[in-house]
């Protein structure tokens, strides 16, 4: 009988720790924005996102050559083969303008993420 009384509080504590370790389950999708790469250019060249909010940038390379999304300021880099799609998740950004470019076509593949 004594073992049963001890086991219940222990089970409750373990359950509570498991719930806390799992983190919040909001069930909400991240705001998502799309960037297309094609023939050494990005479309759109400016992406406006909500400031102080995590978001996802969906990348698609519609061109015939590999292309890279890179932002030194945001410390993000992703290379995509022709026809490939991927995504990058960004931590909340402070209001501002953040440059990105394609390293394979740095003169033409340029743009900005604007957090407002």
Q: What spans do the regions from the language model cover?
A:
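Bacterial N-terminal signal peptides
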Residues: 11-21
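Bacterial N-terminal signal peptides that target proteins for export
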Residues: 2-13
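Sec/Tat signal peptide C-region and signal peptidase I cleavage site
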Residues: 23-27
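Structural beta-strand segments of beta-rich domains
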Residues: 45, 53-57
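Asparagine-centered strand-capping/turn motif at beta-strand->loop junctions
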Residues: 59-61
